[in-house]
Amino acid sequence: MDDPMLNAVKEEESHGDGGGLEVVAGEDGAAAVAAGVAPRPMEGLHDAGPPPFLTKTYDMVDDAGTDAAVSWSATSNSFVVWDPHAFATVLLPRFFKHNNFSSFVRQLNTYGFRKVDPDRWEFANENFLRGQRHLLKNIKRRKPPSHTASNQQSLGPYLEVGHFGYDAEIDRLKRDKQLLMAEVVKLRQEQQNTKANLKAMEDRLQGTEQRQQQMMAFLARVMKNPEFLKQLMSQNEMRKELQDAISKKRRRRIDQGPEVDDVGTSSSIEQESPALFDPQESVEFLIDGIPSDLENSAMDAGGLVEPQDFDVGASEQQQIGPQGELNDNFWEELLNEGLVGEENDNPVVEDDMNVLSEKMGYLNSNGPTAGE
């Protein structure tokens, strides 16, 4: 029995136009005629396929078994990494032989993927679509960005994937900056409080030194003039009597009957000589330089104060405290003003002054002298 393959006859018939027909006959007599056109390769036969990174990523996302860690989004034009930890520890070693999630994101950035949602790991590319695997060949690896304005505008509302790693670092730096600013403000407040305390302490020290100097000058003046202390005590007693008289007349009611005051002035004298002791005339004629408050008090009470009780000027009344004490202004005026004829009438030996200065040396701000 003959082999059927040997019965095939190939005939070529030439035509004037240079074309030809190829006829192939089989045992059943059928013939196949093909145009005499040179064969061409299939479209895309020699084109390079999509990069392995894209194909592996597509397979990983399209796999229904990995939906717990990564899956397509609801719009099917992006994919979401739901569990970055499981994605890095389980899926990346299986598909890419490493477990570095940051490296995977950087690879996505080089192929033009963008982070869609800043609050989750959702990535998108216009040619990375669900059910359209053939579009992966259109995704090309990007060249290094030239940082031009056109590239920045092309990003649109998306966020660059490569910047994801800096977000946490930026947040941490912002928190550190806020803490440092709060610490700086606190230190500045403490510095201001310290300066205020130092200023108050300096003022107190200066006041103490000034009082010590005034005390030394006062004691030196007493040593020069022994009568000065007696005169000062007598003036102090006169002031106290004057204050007592004024305070009692202020407390006395106008409709109260006449009484004898502390300075010995009787109401009977006022009744016998009303013209002589008229309050207004007595103040104008007998008293010169009386403070207005003492003058009003005497007139309101309807009584009369002897002129010798008012032998104190307004400035001295202001220097007397509420309890009859003398303030700093009194001491300054007392030490600055001179007593006429005191130094000539009561000379003091210079040696006594030196002894006093040595004994009172401990009052100075520098501490006690070496002689003590």
Curated annotation (Swiss-Prot):
Report if keyword Phosphoprotein is assigned: yes
Among its keywords, does the record have Transferase?
no
SMART domains documented for this protein: HSF (SM00415)
What is known about its subunit structure?
Homotrimer.
Q: Which gene encodes it?
A: HSFA2B
UniProt region (Hydrophobic repeat HR-A/B), positions on chain: 173-223
Q: Which SUPFAM superfamilies match?
A: Winged helix' DNA-binding domain
The family note in this entry says:
Belongs to the HSF family. Class A subfamily.
A GO biological process held by the record: cellular response to heat
Q: How is it modified after translation?
A: Exhibits temperature-dependent phosphorylation.
Task: Give GO MF terms, alphabetically.
Answer: DNA-binding transcription factor activity; sequence-specific DNA binding
* Listed name of the protein: Heat stress transcription factor A-2b
Q: What is the residue range of the motif AHA? A: 328-337
Key words, A-Z: Coiled coil, Cytoplasm, DNA-binding, Nucleus, Phosphoprotein, Stress response, Transcription, Transcription regulation
Q: What does this protein do?
A: Transcriptional regulator that specifically binds DNA of heat shock promoter elements (HSE).
Q: Where is this motif: Nuclear export signal?
A: 356-363
Induction of expression: By heat stress.
Q: Which GO terms describe its cellular component?
A: cytoplasm; nucleus
Q: Where is this region: Disordered?
A: 247-274
